């Protein structure tokens, strides 16, 4: 027998009871004997009990299957988003490294090696968090998306289409498609 054809003990007992009841009903009908009304009533009760047990078994199987599916989804979500709190704590570190690079005096030759070190550290950190599903939301000239952008201001602009991101004040981040922090942006509007 294949694994699909194998039956659980409950299924076997239920099937045997059903077969026995059907054989008794058929034997009674074939012989044409006059059946005691009490026997007929008991056969009806037996048939009803079998039907109830069969339905109960099906409901129990469905419930077990639903629990298994929910558990699989919960485990999958736990694996996928286990890093959410840790990732959120890393975002200020990334911001500080970016601010350090933005404010660094790149014309000072004495700071060149330090600036390169900070750039490499930032790149290494972004590569490391990227391996775990963290993505940067910080593009300009893209349509404003309230799911990943937080509009801080709206500015008139002839250079940008209306409702497009003009400037990113603070980058946002997603973890496996789930928003960790929205990007703070300036949004363009049509000139009046």
From Swiss-Prot:
GO terms for biological process: protein folding. Keywords: Chaperone, Cytoplasm, Stress response. Belongs to the GrpE family. Its main location: cytoplasm. Homodimer. GO terms for molecular function: adenyl-nucleotide exchange factor activity; protein homodimerization activity; protein-folding chaperone binding; unfolded protein binding. One of its GO terms (cellular component) is cytosol. Pfam families: GrpE (PF01025). Gene3D superfamilies: 3.90.20.20, Head domain of nucleotide exchange factor GrpE. This is Protein GrpE.
